[in-house]
């Protein structure tokens, strides 16, 4: 089933991917049923979303484009931009740009405490991202988590605030985890996000390997109807 084009517009700049909100609108169309696939038209292309029953709840999972791995960023430079010390950033994992449609620099931070202390100077951050960088946004992650079942604790802070759940970034993080050994190929892992924004979210991700390429990036979560209404245009 093909739905109408679905996108999301942010002030000043469009955040092109459908984020974790992709499964919600698909669920809300009434077309989403267990073991069914819905095809969404987003700005990054056609995104298939599949639904299945898990423990009596509807779980939606979208497949993103195969990832492109970009540049490695300097720890000291990034730390200075976001109000951290270079020692707050993990030295055993790279700060690397990954894109499945929107390019994120995945920034591995050592602890939840360091993540809570982020202070982005937007003038210099935008200058960096819009200058020589191949990333459009930063996605901050740490292997220290609040939930023992989670693999990463994440924050996505951008020019208009903080996003509690960023599916486009989580997909990039899934590819990054598989590429750098944080997750095994095809292992479904949990990313917790939105805790600092007091809107905790649970994003399930996985990615496969085909030869030396990361592929089959999947991002999902449980879709629950909380409101029903009509829009008159």
Q: Residue locations for each model-derived region?
A:
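Active-site proximal loop and beta-alpha junction motif in alpha/beta enzyme cores
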Residues: 1-233
């Amino acid at each position: 089933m093909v739905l109408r084009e679905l996108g999301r517009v942010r002030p000043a700049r469009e955040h092109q991917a459908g984020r974790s909100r992709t499964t919600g609108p698909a669920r809300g169309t009434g077309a989403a049923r267990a073991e069914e696939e819905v095809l969404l038209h987003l700005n990054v292309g056609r995104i298939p979303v599949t639904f299945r029953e898990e423990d009596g709840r509807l779980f939606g999972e979208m497949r993103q484009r195969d990832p492109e791995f970009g540049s490695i960023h300097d720890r000291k430079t990034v730390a200075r931009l976001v109000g951290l010390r270079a020692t707050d950033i993990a030295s055993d994992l790279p700060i690397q740009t990954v894109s499945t449609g929107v390019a994120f620099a995945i920034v591995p931070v050592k602890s939840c405490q360091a993540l809570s202390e982020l202070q982005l100077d937007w003038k210099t951050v935008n200058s960096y991202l819009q200058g020589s960088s191949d990333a459009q946004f930063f996605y901050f992650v740490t292997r220290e988590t609040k939930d023992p079942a989670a693999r990463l604790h994440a924050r996505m802070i951008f020019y208009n605030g903080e996003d509690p759940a960023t599916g486009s970034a989580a997909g990039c993080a899934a590819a990054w985890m598989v590429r750098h050994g944080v997750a095994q190929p095809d292992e479904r892992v949990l990313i917790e996000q939105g805790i600092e924004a007091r809107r905790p979210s649970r994003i399930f991700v996985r990615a496969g390997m085909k030869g030396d390429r990361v592929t089959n990036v999947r991002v999902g979560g449980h879709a629950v109807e909380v409101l029903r209404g009509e829009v008159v245009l």
